[in-house]
Amino acid sequence: MAHCGAGGAAPAGLPRSPGLGRKGLPRKGSGERRRLKAVVSEQLSRDVLRLLREEMHTDMVLSVSGSLFKVHRAVLLARAPGFHSHITGHTSRGLTDELIPVDSVEASEFKAFLQIVYSSNKSVKNYEEEILQKMQVGNVMPEKGLDVSFLQCRTSSDCFLGKHEIPADVTSGGDSFISKDDCDLEPVSELGADLLKLYLSQDYHDIDICVDGKSFKAHRAILSARSSYFAAMLSGCWAESSQECITLQGITHVEMSVMMHFIYGGTLDFPEKANVGQILNVADMYGLEGLREVAIYVLRRDYCNFFQKPVPRTWASILECLVIAHSVGVESLFADCMNCIISHFARFWSERSFANVPPEIQKTCLSMQIQSLNHGNAALLLMESDKLITGLPRVKWTEAALSMASQLQGECVTFIVQNFSQVMESASFTLLLQSQAMSSTAHLLDKIFKAIEDSITAENSCSLLMALDTLLKSDSAEEMGFTCRIQAVRDKLWTFLVQSFYAVRHTESWKLMHIDDQQKIQAAALDKGDDRRLGRKPVLSSSQQRRQGSDVIKIKPWTGNNKKLCRASPSTNEKMRSDGLGASGHASGTHRNSVNKVSKHGEGTKVSKVTTEVKTGATHVPGKPKTTIKPQTENNAHTKLESISSTVVGRPARMAATGRKDLAHGKGIQNQEGETTGARPKVLTANLNTQARAKPLQTVKGKDNGCSATVGPSSRSANSSMERLASTGSVDETKENGSVEDKSCDKKPYVSASPGQMVYNGVTSTVAVKSRPVSRVTSGTSSKKSFIHEQGPSVTSSVIKKGRGSSKGLNDSAPQTAAKRGGSSNGYAAAQPRTKSAPPTLAQTQGSQGESPHSVKSSISSRQSDESVTRLRHGTDKQMPKRKVVKQGHATLQKVNAKPTPKNPSQSTKGGTMTSKDSKQKVLPGQVTLQSQASQRPSNPEAATTQRSVLHGVNDNRSQVFKQRPPESLVNLASDTNGPEASPSPCRPQPQSPLGNQEKTRQEREHQDGSTLGDSVKHELRSELTSIEQSHTPAYKVSSQCSANPNCGCIASLKPVTSNPSENWINSNTANTDQVCVSDRERQTGRKGTDREPSVNCVARKAALPSVPAGMSGTLKSAQDDRKLPFHREELSAQGHLPHDCATEDSKCATPTSAVSSRCLLGQPSEKGYKNMEASGTSESHEAPEAPFMGPWDLNTSATHQRESPESDTGSATTSSDDIKPRSEDYDAGGSQDDEGSHDRGVSKCSTALCHDFLGRSSSDTSTPEELKVHEGDLRTEVRVRKPGGGDLPLHSASDDETPRKKPDPWSRSTIVHPREKGSAPRGSVPSAQEVDQVSSSADETEDERSEAENVREHSSPSNSGTQHVQGIINLAFEDGTEHESREFSATKKFRRSVLLSVDECEEVGSDEGEGHTPLQPSLDSLSPSDVFDGVSYEHHGRTGYSRFFKENEATTAEHKYSRGNDGHKNEGFLLSPRSRDFPRQGKQCVSTGEKTRLDVPPKASQQPFPESKDMTSKREVAHGLQQHGTLTDGDTRSQERPCHLELHQREPSSTIPKISSARSLDSCPSQVLPQDGQVTATHPTPPKRANNAVFSGDIDDCDTMAQTTMYDHRPSKTLSPIHEMSLTAACEQKEESGTHVADRASEDEQPFAKQDWTLLKQLLSEQDANLNVTSSLPEDLSLAQYLINQTLLLARDSSKPQGSAHADTWNRWSELSSPLDDLTASATTVSVSSTDCSPQGEWTILELETQH
């Protein structure tokens, strides 16, 4: 960098260096150099002069005319060597500070001379000679002296020159502090040159500075004068001040040399090897401001070429200079560099070195570039940025530049749009038009125009229009061919102006527009008229109501606004009172009529409200409007169903099976399709509570409508949007209703191919379906997806059930409806609000209340099937209204249905959520119900909380029944309650008027049959009706409630009202639901076993009523007794259900075990009964667990589960507030529940256990509605418990939506039980027998759940009527390997299709399973081999495989919960262990996930290894295993810990057990595992590893495990619920399911089988994935869909290899499903499979996989 020429000899070099410098430097920056030189020389002169004035470090004293002058020998030597030689010749040179006289010179004259010497930038030779002459004249011997003087001067000069050469020698000798480069540096002035000579000569140096081992000899005086750093260091008391040699750190010798040259000579150049940036730092550190200026100058000169037009070689150096300036803080240089870069940003940004610029500087470049935008350069910068984007290669180092260019382009477009009128006139815009005209695509112009369209506002529209007009008139636009583009934008602007005329005319720019334009716009705007109203009228027309699909779509937006209208619409058939509740879409036509008739007030608005509600979920659900909407919806739904009965084309096959079925199915499908997409877990979460609360009202109507299954579809249509809100609940309800309906129509059920048969297998199956739908509703979005699959079967089942009989038909119809319209629950909710609004409707509803429980169940179901939440809700809503209609026609039937309401825990859970709302809402319209509810709530807040999900719906429904029914007779309600309780399913068939009577009769018959057959629905309804006396029957009732979605939902809602007023469903929707479920179960158990019931009830109450202590049990009982009066059956149902739950689960988990508890209690009081329950009650148990499963996922249960802290599940102290609040469970689901519950029987612990998903949550149940929604969106599992008598007891859905019904109960209880079991021995101390029974029940329940899910799926399968839920995974899990083999084999041959749970549903299932294990236990116990076989057969019918999988999933969940509860109850919980190990084969995935956890627990449970216990253990182990992942791993302790499910035990135990339970386990487990895996997958895609581990290595083997793992890996885990983590298999399955369901949603509507198959396939996938421990790279949706499709096809082709004798059947069924992984590559999105082999029904509906993410 030395620009001085190469200096020759040092002596010559120095003098010539200035010339050399001038010669080398005169460049383009000469002016800057001159300025810098002047500054530096002046500074040097000033510094040296300061030495003289301050007399720093002087070493010589001159006496002049009596005056003393202190000077520096070195300076005098450098500046005036002759004078120095003259005065020192007379003295000894060695002395310092010697007084030297100067004669013949005046002091003033000498002083002036010294100043010149020290400061002059010019040579002082003349002054020196002058002073010497004066001195010599005064000398005595002037000549001689003169000669000597000159001699001395010459000598001195020579010496100086000679000394100057010495440094050369020294330099050559190794002192490298002086180099030739340094010698070449040019001094700034003569003073600098003289001082530099002094430095180089090293004369009179008095200090050595060591840097990098090199010594620099210097003079203290000059260093101090030039540097503040040295001045401070060399003066004062510093050690360096007295040292001869000092060492400097942090500086290199090159930098030191540059610094010394500048100090002495003020050099303006640096050596080439110097680091300018580092020198800048040195200058700052040593206080050399001049050196800093020189460094900046060098940077500008050498790096930036003084910022003249950059050339390629300078671009990189300018960037380097920019970085240096930024690091050192040279703002001026930084600004100069930045300005240069801004001017040529495209060149600089494309430099590779730009990638090395710090990101903050890059951002500054971008921001400054954006700031530089102006009217003139905006278009230019837009083009430049586009060139940059198109020209840069797509490599790593260009990422930053590309990103910046894209941002800049966007800013340019924004700027141009904002200033379009000015930019348009600029030359750069003309260039832009030219370049775009020459471009193949005028993309930049298109971007500008699109941005203009997007940014049109009232303020800028006028100015934009004027600018476009100007542009259109310009020649350039016409020449370049952009007239069309510009005109298109102008037309849009014109349209906007016309539409927004009233807003635009007030803007300033409007005044600037041309008058002609103003007049034209005004004329066009004023001629609008009432077009919009006209547009709405068709939507409100009755004719449009029949357009279910289109209406759903149309009304959806309105539905949000007109939820009430939507809800009322489904009830059209009953009356137009529900009209106000505008149908979502299916019931829109009927709803319109009804709305127009009954609630003319804003039909459209109501419809909009419903739609909004569906969309917003919680928004509209929590309100009286919803309550009103529900009854209306039911009525409209009924009417619409009837009107649509001929119209429904949703499932022609199923329609063929049963007109009603078709109606419900068609509507459900349409609604599903229309609304399922809209239904979201979040929406559901919020609305589910509302629905749950509103559901009681709706339930009441549902009861009324329970008679006609057709009502479900109508309700769906009417409540399309509501359906979305309550879709989870509704879908589940519908499904549950469908199941119950199937049961009710046990003889009729076969009318519907799959669903009917599924439901037919028994009320248990129906219950399972119902509970499961609840779980599904809870699933939320995933549930929706899964329920799309499930919905088909559900709807079919519903239709079949309708055909089957009033009782079963209704229930089936409800499931179908729920399945089809994810908004069944919403419909119910809508109907309920409407009921509130329209007391007459309530009266009708009261008549229909028997059906209303079904509706609630349906709601629960829809909540359960969040995947089909919208559709299911729609279906349920429609069903509810239809039920209402039927109810109007058949008050008796409705009353009968009222019983089923309490009967269905799932429904109750779901309805409970809605019931909470409805209770609140209903309380306003009618105090009768409220009073009964009030008594219930206060008495058993905790129980209410537990039951809140399940029973709350019942209570509220009951309340609604009371309120709505008072006009009718309470006797009727009681009768309804009794009848429905006996056969909650009849409620669903009731929606049809004809079937209504039949249904009623059937319900009564079911009631009889229920007691006789022990059918879940009948038995449960009857048991509940019968009274607490049938404690185990009530347990089944609870299941029945869940199972009989519509009826049970309503009953469940009413049940809390009647059975558990203290339980206060309304208050603690989530917690209370769980608690209510528990207390109900406990009651059932108590009634079953007298001595068990009291404690159980207490536990239930305590669990359900954190605020209500154990004493509350009395209240609960009294409340139940009170309820008995008007709702004897309901009361029994609720009580029995609740006590059952509480009794068994008390120690386990009052709330979580609600379903399980029901089962457990049932099982405990009579193991025989539970054995039966295992077969018949397996569904129920599953249903109950499913209801619990739903709990975590359902809104309410979700709340409970999400905040599944111990208190959360059992119930919250705020139970009463829950009554009031739509989602008070959100408020109190946590601590209060846990505290009281745990006190009583560890119920509060149950609460924690219940929230395996929420193990980490605070006891105050901190899960937010969002979390609840997530859960709700998750898989909804219906747990069905079979009564000992064979009745299926829909325990609970494990969905939040079902929470009001008791859904949280099973989940909460079972899950809560586990944590509480850990925490409290009481739960664990529940009798082993009971626990074993419960375990069996739980396992059976799991199977039932799956069967139930399968039921939903197999609604289309006629053969799957009753067996389905019983058969489920539960059968496999709880029956002996051989026993289950034969049964499962038939089931396998039937190829039961589990409902394909959506991811959310799967998550919910996982969550529910985690919590529902306890419920599964009862199911296991009650499930007898025959029951299990029956369930299996039922599942075989069409849903068998899938249902089983689902059930088993639920069972696993329930089992998991139960196992947890059992951990406390070690005997029972661990009874599952042996079977669990067996079951792993069957439910290996579930077991593997849960079993790994659970296998650890099983040792405890194995204390009582009963065969059925084993079944239960197996099943529970599956469920538990799944749950164990998050819940049961450590038994109770883990139950309370969220990480539980993370502790997946390796499936070694599973592997050992697989062979025995393989057939059965695989069947049930795959069904269960699939949902659970799906659940886990949906919820915890992150846990894939766990999923792999959890997935059984043996069962569905590696393929399934792999699939599971793949799904699991693909799906991100939902941190929200530990259950997701817990149920790895479920997560995987859920993930698969989610993908499948999303893809399958549309097809699911039409194909329940497809849904079931999907679920089964997903399970297989999950299991295969887990077994393979391979993370498949299946795309979450498409690949899974393809995989599942292929697997389905493969299954259709051949039953696959059995894994063992026990696995043979299971494997036949499952191997059919296990090949999807193999054929996953096949990219068929839609697969048409018709195979009698695969399908027990011999019917494979088209498996349409609509891969939606």
Curated annotation (Swiss-Prot):
Start-end of Polar residues biased regions: 629-638, 707-731, 776-785, 842-863, 904-916, 928-949, 1024-1034, 1060-1076, 1327-1339, 1357-1366, 1549-1580
Keyword terms: Cell projection, Cytoplasmic vesicle, Endocytosis, Repeat, Synapse
Biological process according to GO: clathrin-dependent synaptic vesicle endocytosis; neuron projection development; synaptic vesicle budding from endosome; synaptic vesicle endocytosis; synaptic vesicle recycling via endosome
GO cellular component: axon; cell body; clathrin-coated vesicle; extrinsic component of synaptic vesicle membrane; neuron projection terminus; nucleoplasm; nucleus; synaptic vesicle
A Pfam match: BTBD8_C
Domain BTB span(s) in chain numbering: 58-126, 205-272
Location(s) in or outside the cell: Cell projection, Axon; Presynapse; Cytoplasmic vesicle, Clathrin-coated vesicle
SMART domains recorded: BTB (SM00225)
Tissues in which the UniProt entry reports expression: Neuron-specific protein. Expressed in brain (at protein level).
Annotated stretches, region: Disordered: 1-36, 526-638, 658-680, 697-749, 771-1034, 1060-1095, 1108-1387, 1402-1434, 1453-1591, 1628-1647
Biased composition (Gly residues): 1-10
CDD domains membership: BACK_BTBD8, BTB1_POZ_BTBD8, BTB2_POZ_BTBD8
Domain of life assignment: Eukaryota
Annotated PANTHER family: BTB_POZ DOMAIN-CONTAINING PROTEIN 8, GH15728P
Subunit-level organization: Interacts (via N-terminus) with adapter protein complex AP-2 subunits alpha (AP2A1) and beta (AP2B1).
Summary of the function given for this chain in its UniProt record: Involved in clathrin-mediated endocytosis at the synapse. Plays a role in neuronal development and in synaptic vesicle recycling in mature neurons, a process required for normal synaptic transmission.
Protein name: BTB/POZ domain-containing protein 8
Species this protein is from: Rattus norvegicus (Rat)
Gene transcribed to yield this protein: Btbd8
